[in-house]
Amino acid sequence: MVLSLILQLSTLWPACRADFTPTAPLASYPQPWLGAHPAAVVTPGINVTLTCRAPQSAWRFALFKSGLVTPLLLRDVSVELAEFFLEEVTPAQGGSYHCRYRKTDWGPGVWSQPSNVLELLVTDQLPRPSLVALPGPVVAPGANVSLRCAGRIPGMSFALYRVGVATPLQYIDSVQPWADFLLIGTHTPGTYCCYYHTPSAPYVLSQRSQPLVISFEGSGSLDYTQGNLIRLGLAGMVLICLGIIVTCDWHSRSSAFDGLLPQQN
């Protein structure tokens, strides 16, 4: 009796899940596109809308988050797109999202192919970028050098700064998670750092990169030699002063000693 009941329930289980569990999609069911407004990188407390757009009219849309088996949200519509609203997002709502859609004339449990994966990042500050010199931080005098500022998120705006200068030297909007800044001519040597941020409001700024020193070939050894000469010169002056003090002290002691000797008649 118990075994029979278990078998009956097991046959009903797929039917219960068929309406919301995507099956292996067929090639004839093209994938939708998933986007975020105002951006995929936002600060906490912002309202975010995820839009799932299908290439054809659909009946039901489903939004999925990585790590969850069932849809996070469902929307029943009769057009090509559905909007999923995430109110006052928190860092915990960040993650990987994708969406699917289905039509009324599709079989039970048949969903479209999954959309592109959208990475939603909710943070007050973006991770620190790296700054490297290509081909290297030591270049021939007058040669050009390229500085690559690399973050972790594509589609950001990058700014290159020179230490001691308040305004950015160069500014680049990049579709890649990095940007290359070209430094030309004799003004290349110096210390540089970079930032990146979201290209539109609400702006989220990264931490500053570690400073990078660019120098010409031979300038480091020349500075080192000059430093040694300065140190040797100071040491020589100290020795001369000590010698003068010792000599003066010896003369004063000698004169005092002569004064103590008895005078001969």
Swiss-Prot record:
Q: Where in the cell is it found?
A: Cell membrane
SUPFAM superfamilies per record: Immunoglobulin
Q: Which UniProt keywords apply?
A: Cell membrane, Disulfide bond, Glycoprotein, Immunoglobulin domain, Membrane, Receptor, Repeat, Signal, Transmembrane, Transmembrane helix
Q: What is its main location?
A: membrane
Cross-referenced Pfam families, in alphabetical order? Answer: Ig_2 (PF13895)
Protein task: Regulator of osteoclastogenesis which plays an important bone-specific function in osteoclast differentiation.
- Protein name per the record: Osteoclast-associated immunoglobulin-like receptor
Which organism is this protein's natural source? Mus musculus (Mouse)
Give the encoding gene's name: Oscar
